[in-house]
C-alpha cells in the first residue's frame, strides 16, 4: 500500500471537474445554449459518484488522506446522507486529522450526525474539550455509537461522571460489562477515578491490580501509579508498581523516568488530571486493546482524538506514529515523532523509532544521526539494542559491538542473558573477522535456545566456511531447514553447504528451491549460478549471475559477479562461504 497514490495531474483534473460540477456558476452567457440545468445537475451527480468511487479506491489502497478529501467532497454534494458523513469522518480520523473531523461533524445536519457513529464520537470529544460535559454525556448514552465503541463510551461516561461525583463514577465503573479481555483496563480506570477523588491508597491498589493483568498501556499506567505513590513518600510502593510493570522486560520510558527520579532522590510531583487530561488517559487506556490495536486505521482514529484532548500525552503520539507506519505513511509518522520534545520521557523512543522509519526509507545517514540522538537522551536497554541493530545494519560495526557489549554486560550483572542480543553480537563479530568470538556468542545463544533455526543455520554455516566440523555444520543447517522449510535464506544455506562439499546436484536442488522462495535475493541467485557452473550448466549460470546483478547487490558482490560473467569460476571450487546477517 502506498500513501498519495493519486497523481498531481489526476488531482488537478478532478478539481477542475468538481469546480465545474459544484460551483455556483448558473447558466449564463458563457454557457453553451445546449447546456441545460438538467445536464448540470447530472454532472453534479456524476461528480459525486466519481468522488465516492475514488474515495473507496483510496481506502482500499491504503491512502486515508485522499479518501478523506474525496469523501468530504462527496459529502458536500449530499450533506444529508449519514452513511456518507460516517465514511468521511472515519477517513478523516484515520488520516489523523481530529480537528477536521470535528469541523465536519459539527457542520453536519443534526439528524445526519445522530446516525453516524464516528461523527458522534468526534462530537463527544469536542464537547469534552470545550467543557460541554452534559452534552457529551447525552451523546454517550446514544446507541448509535455501536459495538465497536461500547468500551470507549463506558470509559468516558465513567470518567465524566466521576469528575462531578467521584463515588457515583466509581459505582458506574463497577457496572461496566465484565470482559476478561479488558479487565486490566477496567482496573486502571478505577485507579484513575479514585486518584481523581483523592482516595490514593485505593487508587494505588487498583493500579496494582491492573498491572497484574494483561494491559497494553502498562508503562503509562505504571508511571502514573508509581508517581502517585512516590509523591506521598511511599517509595517502596512506587518501586513495587514499577516492578510489576517491568516483568521480564526492561523498564519502559515512563517508568524509567520515575525510577531515575527515585534513584536520584528527587521529589516526584503528584499526578494531576483535569477533565480533558483524564478523559484522554481513559480513552488512551481502552484504545490499546483488541480490534483497535490490530487496525492501523482504528488506532489512528482513536489516538488522534486522544491527542485532541491532551496534545502532551506522548505515549499516545507514539501510538499514532505507529499507526501511520502501518498505514505506510512514513512522512506522517516522522512528523508525529518529531512533535515529541526532548524533555519528554518518551523522547528517546520517538528518536529511535524515527531512525527506524528513516532507515526503512534508505535514508541511512539521517537514521544514524537520529539513532545517536536517541542514545544521547537515554541509555535504556531497549534504546541500546535498537541502536545497536541500526548501526549493525549500516556497517558501523564498532559502534554496534560497543552497544551490544554494554547490553550483554548489564544482562549478566542481573543474572540474565538474551539469545537475540548474543546472536546480533555474533554477526557483528563475524563481519569484523572475529569468528572465534562469534562462535562463543552463538554457543551461548544456543544454550538458551537450542532449537532456534537462525542460530543453527549461522553456526553451521560458520563451521563449514572455516573448513572444520563440516559434517556437524551440515547437520545443524539440516535441522534449521527442517524447522523453516519455507525460509529462502536457510534453504540457501543448505544448498550452499552442499556446494562447499562438492555435492553439486544436491546443491542445485536446494538452491533452486531457495530461489523460488526468495527470487529477489541476489546472494541466492549468485549461489545458484555458481552451482550451475560447477554442474556443467554454464549458460544457466550466466543467466543467474546476470539476474543477481540486475538486483543491485552490495558493491563487493557486484564486483565478483562481473568477474564471473567475464571469466567464469576458477578451476577449483572456492572455499569461502558467504556470511548471513
Regions from the language model: what does each represent?
Residues 62, 96, 131, 165, ...:
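Residue-level detector of the short coil/turn that links helix A to helix B
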Residues 59, 93, 128, 162, ...:
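Position-specific recognition of the canonical hydrophobic site in helix A of tetratricopeptide repeat
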Residues 98-110, 133-145, 166-180, 201-211, ...:
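Alpha-helical repeat scaffolds
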Residues 56, 90, 125, 159, ...:
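Residue-level recognition of tetratricopeptide repeat
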Residues 25-103, 114-118, 138, 259-263, ...:
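N-terminal leader/linker segments that initiate helical-solenoid repeat arrays
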Amino acid at each position: 500500500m502506498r500513501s498519495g497514490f493519486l497523481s498531481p495531474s489526476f488531482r488537478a483534473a478532478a478539481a477542475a471537474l468538481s469546480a465545474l460540477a459544484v460551483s455556483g456558476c448558473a447558466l449564463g452567457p458563457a454557457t453553451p445554449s445546449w447546456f441545460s440545468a438538467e445536464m448540470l445537475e447530472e454532472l453534479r451527480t456524476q461528480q459525486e459518484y466519481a468522488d465516492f468511487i475514488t474515495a473507496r479506491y483510496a481506502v482500499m489502497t491504503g491512502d486515508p488522506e485522499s479518501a478523506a478529501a474525496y469523501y468530504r467532497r462527496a459529502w458536500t454534494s449530499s450533506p444529508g446522507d449519514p452513511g456518507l458523513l460516517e465514511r468521511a469522518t472515519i477517513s478523516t480520523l484515520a488520516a489523523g486529522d481530529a480537528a477536521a473531523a470535528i469541523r465536519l461533524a459539527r457542520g453536519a445536519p443534526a439528524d445526519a450526525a445522530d446516525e453516524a457513529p464516528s461523527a458522534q464520537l468526534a462530537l463527544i470529544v469536542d464537547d469534552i474539550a470545550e467543557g460541554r460535559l452534559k452534552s457529551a454525556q447525552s451523546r454517550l448514552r446514544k446507541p448509535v455509537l455501536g459495538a465497536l465503541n461500547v468500551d470507549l463510551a463506558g470509559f468516558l461516561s465513567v470518567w465524566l461522571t466521576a469528575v462531578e461525583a467521584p463515588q457515583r463514577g466509581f459505582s458506574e465503573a463497577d457496572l461496566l460489562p465484565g470482559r476478561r479481555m479488558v479487565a486490566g483496563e477496567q482496573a486502571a480506570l478505577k485507579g484513575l477515578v479514585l486518584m481523581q477523588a483523592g482516595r490514593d491508597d485505593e487508587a494505588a491498589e487498583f493500579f496494582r491490580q491492573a498491572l497484574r493483568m494483561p494491559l497494553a498501556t502498562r508503562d503509562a499506567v505504571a508511571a502514573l501509579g508509581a508517581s502517585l505513590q512516590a509523591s506521598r513518600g511511599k517509595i517502596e510502593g512506587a518501586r513495587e508498581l514499577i516492578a510489576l510493570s517491568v516483568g521480564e522486560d526492561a523498564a519502559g520510558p515512563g517508568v524509567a523516568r520515575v525510577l531515575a527520579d527515585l534513584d536520584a532522590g528527587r521529589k516526584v510531583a503528584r499526578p494531576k488530571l483535569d477533565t480533558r487530561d483524564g478523559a484522554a488517559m481513559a480513552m488512551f487506556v481502552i484504545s490499546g486493546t483488541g480490534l483497535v490495536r490490530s487496525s492501523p486505521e482504528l488506532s489512528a482514529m482513536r489516538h488522534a482524538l486522544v491527542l485532541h484532548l491532551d496534545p502532551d500525552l506522548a505515549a499516545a503520539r507514539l501510538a499514532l506514529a505507529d499507526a501511520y507506519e502501518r498505514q505506510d505513511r512514513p512522512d506522517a509518522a516522522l512528523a508525529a515523532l518529531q512533535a515529541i520534545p526532548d524533555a519528554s520521557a518518551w523522547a528517546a523512543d520517538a528518536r529511535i523509532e524515527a531512525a527506524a522509519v528513516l532507515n526503512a526509507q534508505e535514508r541511512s545517514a539521517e537514521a544514524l544521526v537520529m539513532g545517536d540522538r536517541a542514545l544521547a537522551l537515554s541509555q535504556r536497554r531497549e534504546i541500546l539494542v535498537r541502536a545497536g541493530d541500526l548501526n549493525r545494519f549500516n556497517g558501523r560495526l564498532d559502534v554496534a559491538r560497543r552497544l551490544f557489549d554494554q547490553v550483554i554486560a548489564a544482562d549478566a550483572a542481573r543474572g540474565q542473558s538474551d539469545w537475540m542480543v548474543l546472536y546480533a553480537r555474533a554477526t557483528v563479530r563475524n563481519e569484523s573477522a572475529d569468528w572465534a568470538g562469534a562462535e562463543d556468542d552463538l554457543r551461548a545463544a544456543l544454550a538458551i535456545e537450542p532449537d532456534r533455526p537462525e542460530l543453527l543455520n549461522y553456526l553451521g554455516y560458520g563451521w563449514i566456511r572455516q573448513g572444520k566440523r563440516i559434517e556437524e555444520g551440515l547437520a545443524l543447517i539440516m535441522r534449521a531447514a527442517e524447522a523453516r522449510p519455507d525460509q529462502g535464506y536457510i534453504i540457501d544455506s543448505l544448498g550452499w553447504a552442499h556446494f562447499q562439499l562438492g555435492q553439486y546436484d544436491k546443491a542445485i536442488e536446494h538452491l533452486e528451491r531457495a530461489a523460488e522462495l526468495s527470487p529477489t535475493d541476489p546472494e541466492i541467485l549468485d549461489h545458484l549460478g555458481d552451482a550451475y557452473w560447477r554442474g556443467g550448466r554454464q549458460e544457466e549460470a550466466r543467466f543467474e549471475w546476470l539476474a543477481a546483478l540486475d538486483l543491485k547487490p552490495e558493491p563487493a558482490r557486484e564486483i565478483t559477479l562481473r568477474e564471473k560473467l567475464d571469466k567464469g569460476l576458477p578451476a577449483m571450487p572456492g572455499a569461502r562461504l558467504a556470511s548471513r546477517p
